Amino acid sequence: MFYYLYVLKSFKDNKIYIGKTKNLKQRLKNHLRGNVKATKSRIPLKLIYYDVYTNKEQWSKQEKFYKSGIGRDTLKYKL
């Protein structure tokens, strides 16, 4: 099984959203259709980055890191 960590960028407010899912294609569709409460008001969105994991613990650990202050800075540097 694959686990995805992804980053969306809002063209409305120029901010990023960090999320995780087991089905990236379906999750992205939900975001773009406005079916996700956290990003509904920030449409239009664009997928700007994603990572694929096979280890669930590493997946969760990396999400927590990217959502921290240092992690967001690291992610912005990567992008």
Q: Residue ranges of each PLM-predicted region?
A:
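GIY-YIG nuclease catalytic motif and its immediate N-terminal context
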Residues: 1-36, 43, 50-67, 72, ...
